[in-house]
């Protein structure tokens, strides 16, 4: 395994980019990645196996946006740990912990975490309102995520969302979005190898201005 980069950035980065309006009101600007030594995989290999392992056990990537937001990505799959996406969103008015399903908002006038279900229900997407119950039933492994995205693809391609919905549903990401998210893998490899901050390689100023009011 002669690789040394963040090999699976999209799982966490995709939802964060949608939340932050990346490609609409903001753009990814710079990336810096760090890697630990490679030990975890080696411990589970035969002593006779001389396959070189260069992928660090933990790859930490910090992404700066043009608007001043910081995105932190961690690839951590070769060391012992319980499964967790460690998904968290924090801003000037509060913080949401997606793993433990809890939230803290400054307006709550409390210094303790609160259960997030009641608050998130106020902001459920149209797609989840339409298909959320079926999604959880048929896609328990990924908590409905795969099901919802596939239904969005089908709705977009056929230009029909559902018999009980008004209007059509569009897939929430473009090919440009997908290319941008996966480019983190290549850019992180450069950052780790050359020990430096790396710019995202697209001319974003004009695009940012054009999309600023979307």
Which functions belong to the PLM regions below?
Residues 1-6, 163:
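Short, compositionally biased segments
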Residues 4-82, 88, 176-180:
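Rossmann-like dinucleotide-binding domain that binds NAD(P)(H)
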Residues 74, 99-100, 201:
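Short linear motifs in exposed loops
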Residues 190-214:
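C-terminal capping/lid region of NAD(P)-dependent oxidoreductase domains
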Residues 141, 145-153, 181-195:
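Stable alpha-helical structural segments in soluble proteins, enriched in small hydrophobic residues
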Residues 70-72, 95, 170, 197:
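Short, mixed charged/polar active-site loops
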Residues 43-52, 56, 60, 64-65, ...:
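C-terminal glycine/acidic-rich active-site capping loop/insertion
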Residues 37, 95, 184-188:
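Alpha-helical scaffold segments in carbohydrate-active enzymes
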């Amino acid at each position: 395994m002669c690789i040394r980069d963040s090999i699976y950035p999209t799982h966490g980065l995709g939802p964060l980019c949608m939340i932050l309006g990346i490609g609409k009101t903001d753009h990814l600007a710079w990336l810096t990645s760090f890697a630990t030594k490679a030990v975890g995989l080696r411990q589970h290999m035969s002593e006779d196996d001389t396959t070189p392992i260069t992928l660090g056990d933990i790859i930490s990537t910090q992404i700066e946006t043009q608007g001043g937001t910081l995105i932190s990505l961690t690839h951590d799959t070769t060391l012992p740990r319980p499964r967790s996406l460690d998904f968290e969103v924090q801003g000037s008015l509060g913080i949401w912990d997606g793993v433990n399903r809890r939230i803290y908002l400054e307006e709550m006038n409390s210094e303790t975490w609160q259960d997030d279900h009641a608050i998130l229900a106020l902001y459920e997407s149209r797609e989840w309102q339409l298909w959320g119950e079926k999604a959880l039933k048929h896609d328990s492994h990924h908590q409905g995520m795969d099901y919802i995205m596939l239904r969005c693809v089908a709705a977009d391609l056929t230009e029909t969302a559902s018999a009980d919905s008004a209007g059509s549903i569009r897939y929430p990401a473009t090919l440009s979005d997908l290319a941008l998210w996966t480019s983190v893998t290549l850019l992180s490899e450069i950052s780790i190898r050359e020990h430096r901050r790396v710019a995202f390689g697209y001319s974003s100023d004009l695009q940012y201005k054009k999309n600023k009011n979307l």
